[in-house]
UniProtKB/Swiss-Prot annotation:
Gene Ontology, cellular component aspect: chloroplast; chloroplast thylakoid; chloroplast thylakoid membrane; nucleus; thylakoid; thylakoid lumen
Protein name: UPF0603 protein At1g54780, chloroplastic
GO biological process, one term: photosystem II repair
Keyword Mitochondrion: no
Phylogenetic lineage: Eukaryota, Viridiplantae, Streptophyta, Embryophyta, Tracheophyta
Entry's transmembrane regions: 259-279
Source organism (scientific name): Arabidopsis thaliana
Biased composition (Polar residues): 22-40
Alphabetically ordered keywords of this record: Chloroplast, Membrane, Plastid, Thylakoid, Transit peptide, Transmembrane, Transmembrane helix
Comp. bias (Basic and acidic residues): 238-251
GO MF annotation, one: acid phosphatase activity
InterPro entries in alphabetical order: TPM_dom (IPR007621)
Membrane-related topology note: Single-pass membrane protein
Keyword Chloroplast assigned: yes
Family listed: Belongs to the UPF0603 family.
Amino acid sequence: METLLSPRALSPPLNPKPLSLHQTKPTSHSLSLSKPTTFSGPKHLSTRFTKPESRNWLIDAKQGLAALALSLTLTFSPVGTALASEFNILNDGPPKETYVVDDAGVLSRVTKSDLKKLLSDLEYRKKLRLNFITVRKLTSKADAFEYADQVLEKWYPSIEEGNNKGIVVLITSQKEGAITGGPAFIEAVGENILDATVSENLPVLATDEKYNEAVYSSAKRLVAAIDGQPDPGGPTVKDSKRESNFKTKEETDEKRGQFSLVVGGLLVIAFVVPMAQYFAYVSRK
């Protein structure tokens, strides 16, 4: 009995902790190189990945919904469509088989065919390439000139590439256009013809929504200048003078005289007739 109830005999089953430490000691020794006190990296990674997964799921869901909403907005809104068209023109680069990027969809097949014949002949003879771009509306740039410069720099990044290139941009909603190009192109056309084409051919005809004529007449005028031919000139500006609703001075004076006569006659009748009736009544008595 004493042997069974002695403290030494009871110590192993009542105190298993030292035995547990002794058994796990080799494992602890083998992982001593990855202790948090030695390397802070595993500690931070451990903390990051032990966060509740439900919270990360909610954050990802919110970000996904926000991205979806933004994508739908850009896809179906007019601003998003216009913005996409502008950047598509920049990223797609210059047209290879034609000389026209009709993003606005306002040019006919006949106009595109005539432009291809005219501009391909120009490129073959003069080694100058001229491209036309139509856009409905600008949202990324303030005006057509800024956008034209942006297209030129994007399509032809170096001076050597853009030296003999020219770009004509027509904004249909704003009824305006712009022309830009490399040094060789600008010198071949001349500043006067460039200014005249931008201020006459493009805006005047675009205002009447004659986009085909605006583009083709501009091309012919630029090609004529490059070939040294006489300037065909711009379109004839129609006299849009409207009839005024206001009377002239002469008409006003004439109406005023007639009005005075009528008023004077009415006043005479108003005073004379009662007086005549009064005197007639008195004379009878």
